[in-house]
């Protein structure tokens, strides 16, 4: 398969400074979730800036969609339409007096018709969960909301690739979770997502591929398990081993077996513990709890309220920007808003019933993830879809 982006033997140095990039070669495939991970000064941001032509390397070639980048104005304009860049500080990127005008900036400059601009802005704000924010001045927004405006401004141009430099910087934990959940949602819709970060706890469970950088060089590229299992490379990159991987290594050093792949979630750690107890751990005497899934575009708030009033539900989880907006509008306070599926699986293993609110293809993702877990671990956790106006007598039942 032809790479979406290919870098070959890149070299780059800022004026009067040591090399920022040295001998960089990299292929990026469509649909990947990639995290460039390294300490400050490792070259992450510089490398990201080469991916859509904002920096022209001193040596080497950048190939996008199979063609070498020529760096003329028209070529760069087309590239930046399809490969969007979100800066670390959204205040650098947000320039218009209202949210609508800022998100419309790209489509207007791409000569969209008035109708196309309206549709592009509407779709972008819907994607990031900022419907109703059109007339707000950006300086009245929170840090997380500004990040979403910056992302919406890129999405309005319908890019194939979304590049984000330190996407969770300056955000509190809840804001960080919201942004990473949004990136998961966009990737599920087909976008290629590339981020930079020094936060190994963020990158390890999220990325499909980790690229470790140190002093302008790529020192490792592989799955999160591969990249972070090499303690010497992690040390060279001035990083630390992710806590779940470190815990797994400590358990193994004490004689515990770690079947299958290395753990990337709490659910994986539970699997290791159960395996070493030969399946003797019983998390619940009442069997498995049921995971119910509701598509907020197909059911109403009154329907959900009626269900919760008549039945027992231990946990409410929301996945995706649209679902979070609906939950707020419906007066629901979710228990879980990040890593929702795995956390609801844990609840089900403990005999508790969960309700996941989400939209579209994310519904399918819930069923696929639970099915995969059941097959891999010889489980039979039930998943049910809430359909139309049907109100089950008991959510906890199968």
UniProtKB/Swiss-Prot annotation:
InterPro entries: AAA+_ATPase, ABC_transporter-like_ATP-bd, ABC_transporter-like_CS, ABC_transpr_CbiO/EcfA_su, Co_trans_ATP-bd, ECF_ABC_transporter_ATP-bd, P-loop_NTPase. GO terms for molecular function: ATP binding; ATP hydrolysis activity; ATPase-coupled transmembrane transporter activity. It is found in: Cell membrane. It is a peripheral membrane protein. Disulfide bonds: none annotated. Residues 5-240 form the ABC transporter domain. Belongs to the ABC transporter superfamily. Energy-coupling factor EcfA family. Forms a stable energy-coupling factor (ECF) transporter complex composed of 2 membrane-embedded substrate-binding proteins (S component), 2 ATP-binding proteins (A component) and 2 transmembrane proteins (T component). This is Energy-coupling factor transporter ATP-binding protein EcfA2.
């Amino acid at each position: 398969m032809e790479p979406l982006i290919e870098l070959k033997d890149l070299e780059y140095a800022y004026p009067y400074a040591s090399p920022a990039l040295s001998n960089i070669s990299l292929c990026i495939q469509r649909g990947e979730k990639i995290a460039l991970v390294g300490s400050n000064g490792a070259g992450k941001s510089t490398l990201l800036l080469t991916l859509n032509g904002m920096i022209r390397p001193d040596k080497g070639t950048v190939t996008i969609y199979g063609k070498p980048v020529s760096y003329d104005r028209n070529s760069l304009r087309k590239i930046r339409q399809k490969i969007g860049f979100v800066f670390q500080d959204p205040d650098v990127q947000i320039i218009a007096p209202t949210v609508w005008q800022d998100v419309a900036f790209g489509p207007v400059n791409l000569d969209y018709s008035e109708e196309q601009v309206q549709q592009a802005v509407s779709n972008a704000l819907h994607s990031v969960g900022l419907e109703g924010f059109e007339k707000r001045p950006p300086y009245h927004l929170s840090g997380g909301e500004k990040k979403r405006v910056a992302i919406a401004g890129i999405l309005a141009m319908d890019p194939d690739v979304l590049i984000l430099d330190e996407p969770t910087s300056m955000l509190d934990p809840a804001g960080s979770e919201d942004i990473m959940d949004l990136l998961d949602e966009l990737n599920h819709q087909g976008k290629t997502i590339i981020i930079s970060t020094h936060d190994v706890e963020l990158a390890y469970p999220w990325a499909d591929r980790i690229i470790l950088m140190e002093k302008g060089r790529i020192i490792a590229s592989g799955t999160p398990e591969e990249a972070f299992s090499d303690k010497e490379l992690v040390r060279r990159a001035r990083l630390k081993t992710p806590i779940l991987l470190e815990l797994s290594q400590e358990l193994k050093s004490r004689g515990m077996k770690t079947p299958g792949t290395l753990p990337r979630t709490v659910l994986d750690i539970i699997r290791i513990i159960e395996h070493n107890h030969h399946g003797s751990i019983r998390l619940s005497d009442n069997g498995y709890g049921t995971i119910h899934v509701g598509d907020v575009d197909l059911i109403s708030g009154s329907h959900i309220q009626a269900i919760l009033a008549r039945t027992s539900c231990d946990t409410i989880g929301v996945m995706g920007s649209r679902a979070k907006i609906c939950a707020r509008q419906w007066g629901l306070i979710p228990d879980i808003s990040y890593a929702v599926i795995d956390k609801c699986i844990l609840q089900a293993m403990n005999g508790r019933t969960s309700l996941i609110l989400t939209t579209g293809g994310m519904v399918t993702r819930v069923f696929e993830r639970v099915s995969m877990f059941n097959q891999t671990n010889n489980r039979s956790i039930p998943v049910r879809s809430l359909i139309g106006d049907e109100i089950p007598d008991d959510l906890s039942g199968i």
